[in-house]
């Protein structure tokens, strides 16, 4: 039913590693960029190239091709940031419009300046396109924040959720039960789901 109230919808990438730090790590290692340099790499004003963001393997393939064409590492990484952010905006919003204020969470957003800059460049475009009302006198980029400890928010949420669970949930029940689950239980669960 329509209530006229807005609903907060926390969301995490659940589709593919293409929108995660794992892809950044893998491509960064291939390009041999020191971590300290990666953290300071920019996005603003850097030439972008088409990179698939839907799949980490596709992104890596595109980056490999661009690298062979002589595209410099700063342009490769900025293009990867763009691909990841655009994919995440598609997957995470699931057709909804992000409301101000947006929190950027997770390690890549915490540590990599170019990722933060990319979000701050792309989210305001969506707000403008969709006519989202923003607080007066506040630059749109200031409504996109990376809180202290952003890299730990998912873990903190898991802990908070776990505090509400029964004390027996998540306790190690011995090798026998683990072995049973790996050899039998997992297959039984798949069969129940029709898999």
Language-model-derived ranges and their functions:
Residues 61-90:
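Adenine-nucleotide phosphate-binding core of ATP-dependent small-molecule kinases
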Residues 5, 157-195:
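Acidic, glycine/GT-rich loop-and beta-edge segments that sit at the periphery of enzyme/chaperone cores
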Residues 34-67, 81:
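Conserved ATP-utilizing enzyme core subdomain
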Residues 11-19, 79-81, 103-109, 143-154:
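Active-site nucleophile and cofactor-binding loops and adjacent substrate-binding regions
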Residues 6-47, 160-164:
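Glycine-rich phosphate-binding loop plus the immediately following alpha-helix
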Residues 83, 93-127, 131, 147-151:
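Glycine-rich phosphate-binding loops at beta-strand->alpha-helix junctions
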């Amino acid at each position: 039913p329509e209530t006229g109230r807005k609903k907060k919808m926390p969301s995490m990438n659940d589709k593919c590693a293409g929108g995660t730090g794992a892809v950044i790590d893998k491509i960064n290692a291939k390009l041999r960029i020191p971590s300290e340099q990666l953290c300071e790499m920019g996005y603003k004003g850097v030439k972008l190239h088409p990179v698939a963001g839907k799949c980490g393997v596709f992104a890596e393939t595109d980056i490999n091709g661009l690298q062979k064409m002589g595209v410099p590492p700063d342009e490769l990484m900025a293009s990867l940031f763009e691909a990841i952010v655009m994919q995440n905006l598609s997957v995470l919003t699931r057709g909804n419009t992000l409301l101000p204020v947006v929190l950027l969470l997770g390690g890549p957003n915490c540590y990599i300046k170019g990722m933060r800059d990319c979000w701050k460049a792309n989210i305001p475009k969506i707000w403008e396109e969709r006519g989202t009302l923003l607080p007066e006198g506040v630059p749109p980029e200031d409504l996109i924040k990376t809180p202290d400890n952003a890299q730990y928010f998912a873990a903190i949420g898991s802990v908070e959720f776990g505090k509400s669970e029964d004390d027996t949930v998540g306790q190690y029940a011995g090798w026998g039960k683990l072995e049973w689950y790996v050899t039998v239980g997992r297959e039984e669960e798949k069969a129940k789901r029709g898999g």
